[in-house]
Amino acid sequence: MTTLEMQNLSNLEKELTEVEEKTFRLISFITLYKQYDDLPRKERRLVLKQHKFAYKYYATLKKRIKLIKSR
C-alpha cells in the first residue's frame, strides 16, 4: 500500500470509531433515557431514521476499510 492509501485507511478507521460511538450513544439514549414506546409517533420515526442512517454509514465504512486492506 502507498502512504496515501495508508493515510486514507487510518482516517476511515478513525471515522468508523466515531460512527460506532454515535450509534451506541443513540441506542443507549433510546433504551436508557426514554423508552421507545413512550415517544410520540413523529419522534419515533425520527429516531428510527437516525438509527438506520447511522447503521448504514457504519456498514459502508467497514466495507471500504475491508476493501482497502484487501488491496
Question: Which residue ranges define each predicted feature?
Answer:
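Extended, charge-rich alpha-helical interface modules
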Residues: 2-71
